[in-house]
Amino acid sequence: MASGILLNVKEEVTCPICLELLTEPLSLPCGHSFCQACITANHKESMLYKEEERSCPVCRISYQPENIQPNRHVANIVEKLREVKLSPEEGQKVDHCARHGEKLLLFCQEDSKVICWLCERSQEHRGHHTFLMEEVAQEYHVKLQTALEMLRQKQQEAEKLEADIREEKASWKIQIDYDKTNVSADFEQLREILDWEESNELQNLEKEEEDILKSLTKSETEMVQQTQYMRELISDLEHRLQGSMMELLQGVDGIIKRVENMTLKKPKTFHKNQRRVFRAPDLKGMLDMFRELTDVRRYWVDVTLAPNNISHAVIAEDKRQVSYQNPQIMYQAPGSSFGSLTNFNYCTGVLGSQSITSRKLTNFNYCTGVLGSQSITSGKHYWEVDVSKKSAWILGVCAGFQPDATYNIEQNENYQPKYGYWVIGLQEGDKYSVFQDSSSHTPFAPFIVPLSVIICPDRVGVFVDYEACTVSFFNITNHGFLIYKFSQCSFSKPVFPYLNPRKCTVPMTLCSPSS
């Protein structure tokens, strides 16, 4: 109720020109009041249009400027009214214009704001399109709802983009950290390679220096002796020529024969163009080998040897080591001497605890192969064998088999893929070979192909990819250099690791994954 009275009072003290509360109010003789600035501006406008009489902007009654009087009473009311504010509770009941105190019932489309009827008539909104709030509220409610849904959709997209960029950021950090680790590891490997190559090359040069200088020193000594001998001979001849006739002829034939028969011994020389030229190692190739070896080593399995009853293939208690023991020491056929065993044939293969033994004791050819106890029927498998200091060995994989009455055991010594053997070997200390299927030239024996091995391996890695049907051999001593790879292997049955120490008593050892 009080707010209604205040609003009515406010209407009475509002300037009809600016529609604001009166400022320094002046009253005309007709009783209407105006702001001093507003009525002065109206007076100047009349002078501009050369109007002889001034009239009230509201009632158009003429007045003279000297009749305008300050309205102190209205000024006091305005001052008090400016100090009065509606209570919060009353303000919540009715929305009123902050400028005019009128109800906010209209909407200005151009300015997109709610106004009162006095605002609509003011200079600020003159000529604008205005509507009752009820007329446009539903339309704008729909628009705002559509905008809200669109914004929520964009918010979801923004959140997804934010999550994606965070995920990408994390992925990049992981990848870069991984690459940094790999780079450090690769360069560490390169440093190891360079250190090893440098040490090896320096050792070769030192050996070359030792051998050549030793030979040249020997030649130098011989040349010194030869020169000294010639000096002595020349001195003898000069003495004879300068001496008496008796000295000249005494033993003259002997000394002439010594001169005529003397052959000048030439020293042994070494041509520099025949020297081995040092070439920097192929670091990229070595690094690729390292990476391949690192990859296959992820499939390292702990292989042990199957128990067997082969007396000359001795397996250690830990089932990791097999060595050859001369059967002449352990076996003597009834009525025979050890010497008569040299032509016996004794060939044995082992699968688990089962052994296959040829009873034919003629043309004695020792076959001491043993199998690992773990069968391979799928997947990828890798293991390493220590063959250091051995002068002969055979290793690889062998297909499991069960002998029958028709099985020709002599074929067991034919290390051929068609018989289930994918193996490589060493003989005579430095001759490496791969055993292939027999050819027309060797119909009953494996076709042995020499392998070029620059650095003799102390340890050999074996990798079997059952699904890819491949068996690969790596020279661990030479940075994982690939020695040989069998492709298109016909794995029709389980295969087993195969080790044969041959006639070398130095053991072969299966390395543990932690070694």
Swiss-Prot record:
For Zn(2+), which residues are the binding ones?
97, 100, 119, 125
Stretches for region Required for interaction with GABARAP and for autophagy: 187-200
Keyword Ubl conjugation applies? yes
Zinc fingers (B box-type) at which residues?
A: 92-133
Q: In which pathway does it act?
A: Protein modification; protein ubiquitination
The GO molecular function terms of this record are: pattern recognition receptor activity; ubiquitin-protein transferase activity; zinc ion binding
According to the UniProt entry, the note on domains is: The B box-type zinc finger domain and the coiled-coil domain contribute to the higher and low order multimerization respectively which is essential for restriction activity. The coiled coil domain is important for higher order multimerization by promoting the initial dimerization.
Q: What does this protein do?
A: Capsid-specific restriction factor that prevents infection from non-host-adapted retroviruses. Blocks viral replication early in the life cycle, after viral entry but before reverse transcription. In addition to acting as a capsid-specific restriction factor, also acts as a pattern recognition receptor that activates innate immune signaling in response to the retroviral capsid lattice.
The name under which this protein is listed is: Tripartite motif-containing protein 5
Q: Which organism is it from?
A: Chlorocebus aethiops
